Regions:
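Class I S-adenosyl-L-methionine-dependent methyltransferase catalytic core
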Residues: 1-239
Length: 239
């Protein structure tokens, strides 16, 4: 979920990309029709933030759809800090080695994003409870962030916004409520909302504010519900 502004926000943003090795073949990212302003949907999206739209379109058109290219395109707030070390278990034969690598990877992310007020977490597959049957050291767990990995950021006073892919079996609002409940249970922080985005695949953006940022983030989400962005993003408040 890219912030719809090039300006520096009142709070500094950090991003953990959860970058994993490229997979071939992989259909992820093939749906880019929305970045064609000659289409009805593309034209509507561009009106929301022309500079952001054009920046993303230029990255896709260049063929270099990397984290570095995204940063170079200037589509993020000016003082954003990012962590994009690859999360891979290649060469890690056993569970102990994989678990240790993941702990070290998270430690590096924490060090890189020290000083950021809000941290955006962007795993390919979304969020999982820490007691999920496929634990974080599983060879195929790298596409997910586990809720307990968000705890160290929150514990040192950073609010977290985390991207999550919904599943097809349950209604999205039900999934959002369950996700917010899981986060409250595991992290001891009261979620503010989950923001739903339906273009392409449905995603939720879980908003976990620390007390110092709660009122500011609540005002921003309330403003979003009355803005043109409300046609694209649905705020599901915590009940």
């Amino acid at each position: 979920m890219v912030a719809p502004s090039f300006e520096s926000p009142p709070v500094r943003l950090g991003i953990v990309w959860y970058r994993v090795p490229d997979e071939t073949p992989d259909a992820d990212g093939e749906d880019v029709e929305y970045l064609d302003p000659s289409t009805e949907s593309g034209a509507a999206l561009r009106l929301l933030d022309p500079r952001l739209y054009d920046g993303l379109a230029s990255v896709v058109a260049s063929g270099d759809r990397s984290v570095a290219a995204l940063a170079a395109a200037g589509v993020l707030p000016l003082d954003t800090r990012t962590f994009d070390d690859e999360l891979t278990f290649a060469g890690q034969a056993g569970r102990t080695e994989r678990a240790a690598f993941r702990v070290d990877w998270l430690s590096r992310a924490l060090a890189e994003l020290a000083g950021c007020a809000v941290v955006f977490v962007d795993p390919d597959g979304g969020l999982r409870r820490s007691d999920h049957k496929r634990r974080s050291w599983h060879p195929k767990a790298v596409k997910h962030a586990y809720l307990d990995e968000l705890g160290p950021f929150i514990g040192r006073g950073q609010s977290v916004i985390a991207s999550h892919h919904t599943k097809g079996s349950d209604k999205v609002r039900k999934q959002a409520r369950r996700l917010m409940g899981d986060a409250a249970e595991e992290l001891g922080v009261e979620p503010l909302a989950a923001v739903r985005a339906d273009r392409g695949s449905t995603r939720l953006f879980l908003v976990l504010p620390v007390d110092a940022h709660r009122s500011h983030l609540e005002r921003r989400l309330t403003a979003l519900t009355g803005s043109p962005w409300a046609a694209e993003l649905d705020v599901i408040w915590r009940e």
